[in-house]
UniProtKB/Swiss-Prot annotation, chains A, B:
E.C. numbers: 2.5.1.16
Active-site residue numbers: 155 (proton acceptor)
One GO BP annotation of this record: spermidine biosynthetic process
Pfam families tied to this protein: Spermine_synt_N, Spermine_synth
Any one GO MF annotation of this record: spermidine synthase activity
Main location: cytoplasm
Reaction(s) the record says it catalyses: S-adenosyl 3-(methylsulfanyl)propylamine + putrescine = S-methyl-5'-thioadenosine + spermidine + H(+)
Name of the molecule in the record: Polyamine aminopropyltransferase
Lineage: Bacteria, Bacillati, Bacillota, Clostridia, Eubacteriales
Region forming the signal peptide: none
Keywords on record: Cytoplasm, Polyamine biosynthesis, Spermidine biosynthesis, Transferase
Assembly notes: Homodimer or homotetramer.
Amino acid sequence: MELWFTEYQTPTLGITCKTKKTLHSEKTEYQELAVIETEQFGRMLLLDGIIQTTVADEFVYHEMIAHVPLFTHKNPKKALVVGGGDGGSIREIVKHPSIEKAVLCEIDRRVIEVSKEYLPEISCALDNEKVEVVVGDGIKYVKEHKNEFDVIIIDSTDPIGPAEGLFAIDFYRAVYDCLKEDGIFVAQTESPFIDKELITRIIRDVKSLFPITRLYTCAIPTYPTGYWCFTMGSKKYDPLETDIDSIPDIDTKYYCPQIHRAAFILPKFAKELIK
Amino acid sequence: MELWFTEYQTPTLGITCKTKKTLHSEKTEYQELAVIETEQFGRMLLLDGIIQTTVADEFVYHEMIAHVPLFTHKNPKKALVVGGGDGGSIREIVKHPSIEKAVLCEIDRRVIEVSKEYLPEISCALDNEKVEVVVGDGIKYVKEHKNEFDVIIIDSTDPIGPAEGLFAIDFYRAVYDCLKEDGIFVAQTESPFIDKELITRIIRDVKSLFPITRLYTCAIPTYPTGYWCFTMGSKKYDPLETDIDSIPDIDTKYYCPQIHRAAFILPKFAKELIK
């Protein structure tokens, strides 16, 4: 018998992976949560049947969502991750020597607990002494903290269901207020190939709030189309002006100083989205 | 009833697309050839059940395989495409004003004929007056022509079955001899995420023959992992030294002068492949 897991990434497109076994499956207060072991990508975290991260390619997403804003900022001391209960973004954040505190605010306690059990290589820094884990609503947390963080990372699920509010202009406004006067936020904002309307709208919203708005991309095999983007809003520092020669060599598999620059260079069709 | 076409991109990974109808299907002298109409990517050309090109995302592959070498060369007049019977690479080549002649050498006459019938937006330049279409073995053609082309594009299927010889060092040696003294060739060389051994071997082979060897990448949703690479061997011109400010604006959707530079900037794990 062969088992294949299929995610329908759009109503007319799917990715299908041969599966060794289901390691965990439950219905949490918020969503269906599962960890399966696939042949191609190893262990894979699923929320409502959608691939969140896999041990084979998680490095791309987590390195790119964390190091690009952290190295754009001159001296980040305090960072917040909204969502990201698997801990991958936190793991990358604590690699930065200047970081004194990293807060994770994840709404679903079970995502954290299951990641700790089944994805130790991703969640490994959640017990780091610099890390505070808050189980709660990220929108509420952001609204209750003002002028506090150097970097905020919106490490959310897709903009349907529980994460919808994390893609709204009201939330970006709260993020602005939650950042210090030279703060930077980054949000994962889906695929430039198939989420054009969403990205165009987000860019417009962020531009209306932040003096510097940028879009950057990377290659993630298990996400729809394999091509993914992040939107950055920055109060002071421009990632295009980062002195990449000053970026220290850190332990990464995708991110490097040259990629810090190249990730912002968009193909023509994607440049149209940020006009 | 719903019809879904699934390509198994590896033994443990597949892409699946909802399909409106099969427009064409036949067994040619060389392979199974089909054109299907999918909801997500429109018309799609399949050879032996493997996606070759789709009307939705073909622009990435064809622009990147053609314009990068053509704009690296200072004054390309004569270009050869080995394979590429759909005509997409030829369509891009004839956009260059300096091109006087473009030869297509495709082994399977039916690929050309079926592309002309079902993929007119891709094959549209095959009847251009600058284009010569040769139905024949690309290896034989290259071996019989010496010191003749400015740019050679190896627009092949995967390195199994009929195209295997197009990934061999003997063929690259013949390509070297077929190029003029300042010639450049580019070959499609699969995915940096899952074809690491192949790419490492090709880079080593090309380095042993050409003074300048480069790897560049782009994002192609319908190819395995969505992240694709091309290997360039050049006798004189280095694409990293192209004066990108001198590149004229041409009608493209992915390629642009900035991408000409950025495509060669590789994430850390891919840089390992070319060491």
